Amino acid sequence: MEKPIRVRFAPSPTGALHIGGVRTALYNYLLARKHQGKFILRIEDTDQNRFVPGAEQYIIDTLQWLGIDPDEGIQQGGPFAPYRQSDRKDMYRKYADQLVQAGKAYYAFDTPEELEAMRERLQAAKVASPQYNAISREWMKNSLTLPQEEVTARINAGEPYVIRFKMPHKEIVRFYDQVRGWVKVETSTLDDKVLLKSDGMATYHLANVVDDYLMQISHVIRGEEWLPSAPLHILLYQAFGWEQTMPQFVHLPILLKPEGHGKLSKRDADKHGFPIFPIAWQDPATGNHIEGFREKGYLPEALINFLALLGWSPGGDQELFTKEALVEAFSLERIGKSGVKFDIQKANWFNQQYLRNKTEKELSVYLTSELDKREIAYTTEQAEQICALVKERAIFPQDFWEQGQVFFQAPTTYDAQAIQKRWTSQAHETLAGFVDILPTISPFNAASIKESLADFLKERSIKINEMMPVIRIALMGTTAGPDLMQSIEIIGQKETIRRLRTALRIIVPVGS
């Protein structure tokens, strides 16, 4: 019988969740849903010194906003609770002791000063990587070098100690990664990692392996930065005798800077003017409020689609996928090895596509919510007409107000550069003449307005394209905007006449 798919997203609550972490959560989620498996949220808070208040709730809120819903976790519970590692502390102790008894780990009593002296000694000897390993452990203060009676006495006396993994000397660790294929590592390059700290709390390495075993995790899908830790984790599985139930490893390619060189960081995001966090983060240390993708106006479904394609390819030309379609198409085999450039323009494109696919009724909420705040009167039909006009240019929900407010509020300023280029004496006189015929246009709709304007200009041998920018400046204050005739129809006959007359009164023709 094939092993059930059970995957976990296991972030540490040490600050705001990076967008790369969201992609990791998403890939785990997609694999679980694809195979009717279980997606687990486990909080890895073994490093209490780095714990940041609010970070755990931030992780929960992020997944909730994106619809990446855990089947088991700190809120949902489940058959392998608790799902917070600090609540599992006593259990890790038992497994650490088991390794010591099996000769796979040992007690180490070295003080920070002694550890520093060891590193200095190795550096002086020109050792490339000064570390606590199979060679240096021989002259350190641990249960491999001290008599058993002394070890027992030190422990009974309450002397601080850690439990270290006894790294095999000069062996080859081979394991298969679903993305990278076979990986080989020489153990002489690895150190004797601490498994249990002096405060009795397990380190990430021990807790991670024990929990993955106990929670029956089938696949460990995580970032490439954890690849160097994989050999130790393989050796821990072997030390416990758990090789037969060891999960498959999947190390995801890193997200690169927009330029393509180096790992994406908050500094890079700030430099290019885009967020690095999924939702807003209030830094408890500094009080700084940092906006996330949500606050910038990215739709959760668009962000999911964008992130899914950062490292995974469905094959073919299709780019737009609902979450359900992603589940159906997803496979580990199509995850690439190479780092992926974080292209914010592509993220914007996805957001734009998802907005365009919404109905005018759905989009109108983005506009009417702002109108309601400002107590500006409108009709439902009017709001939907405006959204239909604006949607092709909108990238974010807030664009519907930013581009739609001009339909309700006359411009208070006019584009000086556009005036300098367009507002000649002839244009001024022509506009004044057009204003005079506006009251006669009936019905007052885009087609009639355009026809009347064309006839009016034809009599004066003026091209319509010469006057359109002038009318737009008078009506909206700028030369950019949605279809002009439809805009005039929505703004209405009376308000259009008022705006054009105001502009004629305020704007002085060039050269006058």
UniProtKB/Swiss-Prot annotation:
Extent of motif 'KMSKS' region: 263-267
Compartments (UniProt record): Cytoplasm
Gene3D superfamilies, sorted: 1.10.10.350, Glutamyl-trna Synthetase, Domain 2, Glutamyl-tRNA Synthetase, Domain 3, HUPs
Binding site for ATP: 266
Matching Pfam families: Anticodon_2 (PF19269), tRNA-synt_1c (PF00749)
PROSITE patterns: AA_TRNA_LIGASE_I (PS00178)
Heme keyword on record: no
GO BP field: glutamyl-tRNA aminoacylation
Catalytic activity reported: tRNA(Glu) + L-glutamate + ATP = L-glutamyl-tRNA(Glu) + AMP + diphosphate
Keyword check for Cytoplasm: yes
Protein keywords: Aminoacyl-tRNA synthetase, ATP-binding, Cytoplasm, Ligase, Nucleotide-binding, Protein biosynthesis
Coiled-coil region: none
Family according to the record: Belongs to the class-I aminoacyl-tRNA synthetase family. Glutamate--tRNA ligase type 1 subfamily.
Subunit field text: Monomer.
Name of the molecule in the record: Glutamate--tRNA ligase
Organism whose genome encodes this protein: Amoebophilus asiaticus (strain 5a2)
Source lineage: Bacteria, Pseudomonadati, Bacteroidota, Cytophagia, Cytophagales
Gene name as annotated: gltX
